[in-house]
Every structure is written in C-alpha cells, then in structure tokens.
Amino acid sequence: MRKLRLDPYLLLLLVLALPALAPLAAPGYMFDAHDGRHSVFYVQMFDASIRDGALWPRWAMHHTQGLGYPTFLIQAPLGFYVAEVFVLLGLSITMSVKLAWLVGTLAGAWGIYRLTVYWLGDHAIAEWRAGGADGPRLDGVRLAAVASGLLYTYFPYHLVDLYVRAALADTLLLAWVPWLIYAFDRLLVLGSAPGWPRRLGVAALVLAGTLLTHAFALLSIAPLVVTLVVFRLAQRWRRNGFPWSETLLACAGGALALLIYAIFLVPLLVEGRYLNQQVYVSGGYDYRDHFVQVGQFLSPYWGFGYSDDPVGANDGMPFQLGLVQVVLAIVALFTVRRAERARAEMGYLLVVGVGLLFVMSPLARPLWDAVPPLAVIQFPWRLLALSGFVFSALGGLALWNLLPSALPGVRPEGGLVVMGALAMLASYPYIQANLSPIEPWREDGRAVYQFEREHPDMFGYTTWVTQPFTTTVLSAAYASPDYVEHHGDAPADGRLEITAGKGSVVESYVGGSSAGGVVAMQTPGTVRINVYYFPGWMV
C-alpha cells in the first residue's frame, strides 16, 4: 500500500491564505455589509426548518413580519447546508457562517492550485513523489500553483465578497469554479480513456454543486464551462477530426448535472410564478445601473459603500482587478506565443478574460437587453468573480513560463516566491471589515423583523397579495422586550386567529416550516393560521 504523502506546497498555500481571513477570527461580525445580515438570518431560518423536519427547506418563517416566505425556493441551498453543518455541531449562527467562508476560501485556493499543476504537467507530481537524486529542491510547477492560489485568494473582488458584501453564496461560488474547470477539462482531454465513467460522474457532481450554490450560476458559471468545452473540442477537431466521444461526454456531464439541479430548478420554474419577482430585477437591482467603467477595473479605490452611481463615477464599492493580476495579464499577452507549457490554456484564459471585461462594461448593454434572462444576475460586476479565477490562473501559468529554463533550479524559482508574496502584499490593505457586536437579537427572528422595518421596499409578496403591507398581527411580538426564541419557535402568540364564530385559542406553536395549535370552539366558525398561503402547505 502506497504511503500517503502530504504536499508541502499545498500546505504552504493554505497557511499563506489564512491572513486573508484574519477579520473572521476577530470578535464581532459584518452586520453593516451589503448582505451581512442576510447571510446570518438566512442560515438561522434554514436551520429552523431543518430542525422542524424539512430536510430540503423551502420556507423562511420570519420573513414578511412572521407570515413567512418561500425564500429557499429562490435561494440555492448548498451554501446554507455548509453553514448548517457547523450549526448542528453546536456553534453559533455567525460563527458557522464565518467557518463556511473559511472552508470555501481554502477549497477555492486548493482547486486553482490543483488546476495549475494539471495544466503545467501532471508528470511533475510523479517526479515529486519519486523524489530526486539531488536531494530536496524547490518545484517550479507547484510554486507557480501556489502563486495562482494566492492570486485567487487575495484577488480584490474576493475580499469584496467577504468583507464589503459579506455574501455567503457568492463567496462560496468561488470555491467551485476552479474545481469545475478542472473536472470538465479532464473529462474532455482524457475522453474515453479508462476511467471515463468516474470522470463523468465527478464532472456532473461538481457542476451540479456549483448550480446549487447560487441561483444565478446557471446563467454565469455554466457559460464559462461551455467556452471550455468549445475550446477543447476545437483543439481536438483540428488534430483528429470531429471529437464525437468527447462531445457526447461533455453533453452527458451537463445533462446529468441538470438532472441533479432539477430538485431546485423545477420548483423554481413551476412555483416561482406565484411570487412577485419584479422586485428582484428592478430599482436597485436593475442591471442597467451596475455596469463597470473601464477605469474602475484599474482604480485602487476601496470602500464599503454600494454600487449606487449609474454612471460609475462615484460608486461606493471597488471593482478593481488588482495590480499584480493586471501586470501578469499584460505579461501573458506578450509572452503567450513563446510559452513553453500551457500555451493553449493561456490563450484561452486571455480571450475569456477580455470577454468578461467586455460583458461587464457599458458597451455590452445591447447584449444584456437582447437576453432578458440575464437580468437575474442583477449586477454585471458580479462577473468579477469569474475574472478573478481567469486572471489568477493565467498569472500562475505566465509566471512559470517566465522562468529561465524548463527545469528551473532554486534561483529562478525564487521569482515565484516573490510574486506570490506580492500578490498578498498588494491586497493586504484591503483585508479589513467593519465589525459590530454580535447581540442575541442578531441571530433570531428579530433580525429579519428589524431589516424589514428599515427596508419596507424589500417585502416579498405573492400573487395572492392584493394590497401591500408592512406590518402584521405578529409584528408586535417581534418588538416585545420579552421576545424569546429557540430554533425558530417564535412568535407563536397571534399565530392562530378566530375570524368567525366563538371560541378561544388553547395553545399555538410555530416551527421553521410549520405552524398550528389547538382551538376550543363554542360555535361553528373559522380559524385562520397567520402564515402566507402558498402551494404545498398541508393542513
């Protein structure tokens, strides 16, 4: 049996990635970040539904002032499951969210490390495992992979997602992207070689996991996979004729992923029409107001505000690509034709990177207008997440090809160490968060109640609502100084209401996905359960 050997370069990368997460170790939480409160109270309501027996949650009971809302019909659930693991282990909601970010960040760094090693030559791993007669020496391929991982971890928009936006699903999506490209690239490059069923299954599962992490991944991440498939098939076609087996494998991988994703997509398509979804693509979520000006890609500006200037001149949040990433992209542009390894991959990344920058710019508005489903993405600048992957992978490949020889010694490899350190230092000033104390009400239904009071325009209505409202019979319970909640079991008072006849409410209860109680009626009458009506409720 072969002895398991740890990769010291991977361990080095994971250790060097930890400073990017330093604010997560501090007391407090980013409640004032764009999605900071959502990341916490979504997990709180997800946990309440899990504990109430809904293993695939759909309902978030605290929304709409206690009437509830099918939040998890439109919010992809996988990120919440990651946090839920830590909640069930006994950790607090906010600590669980922080640990989910930790897992996602390290998984993403590991993924792009593995992809870079793969693109620069898997034989390097075999050579490393076998050892060398000359004794230990630095490995240029894995050091380039470490550089890619650091570029990805410290990419400015990754820090934006963590500390400016505090967006759980968006940040965890970054963990999937390199693994997704790696899985599909192996599926296409190795084709029908032995082991193809395993590679097919892995590719399908990784794509399904990506889609189940964020609702907009189908419209943003999936097209990236399509570009990779087209790139590899075109390569094979030029050499050996049309690659039928690879084409079938790619289609099968996508189809299997969609079959898994159907558990989320089908209810969304069937029942989403009962929700007033215009609120999610209008007002502050209108993509027309969130394109990125070219200068913003290069601007060193950093702030914790919003993308609130339609022309981009005074946006309160940063959209920079990062100094090191830009320099390495320019270097790659001028050296790609002379690259010794991964030349085709560098060319692919350059084309995709330029395409992403175009799609985020105002020049692409006709494209967004012509494809209405793209409005679901809401913010064109969200594609900076993909740019981070593209330019980080490109940076690692470019760095290796800048080395003086194919089998570099210690001296040229030192340049990789320096560039990896520069990737960290260039973004180090941005590793900061606006932290607030974690008060008890921040982790129960009062957090949702308070948010809806501050943002009544964010109320979720169904098609059965004829008149907008901002308070319910349950609002007073949330505002009460005596409010107490354990895993979503409040507010119960006011949950049952006798609307006709005479009687009294003996007891009532509420859970994450259920509500009810006992009523003693003196005459025939009608009892209303104060919960939003929606298809699927069982009485």
Which stretches of residues belong to each language-model region?
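Membrane-interface helix-loop-helix junctions at transmembrane boundaries of multi-pass membrane enzymes
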Residues: 2-5, 131-137, 194-195, 236-250, ...
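Membrane-interface coil-to-helix junctions
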Residues: 16-108, 150, 155-173, 288-303
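Membrane-interface helix-loop junctions at the exits of transmembrane helices
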Residues: 17-28, 49-55, 91, 144-165, ...
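Hydrophobic/aromatic-rich transmembrane helices and adjacent perimembrane loops
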Residues: 102, 170, 219, 373-401
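Signature aromatic-anchored transmembrane alpha helix within multi-pass, membrane-resident enzymes
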Residues: 226, 254-258, 354, 393, ...
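Periplasmic/ER-lumenal interhelical loops and adjacent helix-loop junctions
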Residues: 246-249, 253-336, 438-499, 503
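Active-site-proximal, structured, solvent-exposed surfaces of multi-pass membrane proteins
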Residues: 481-538
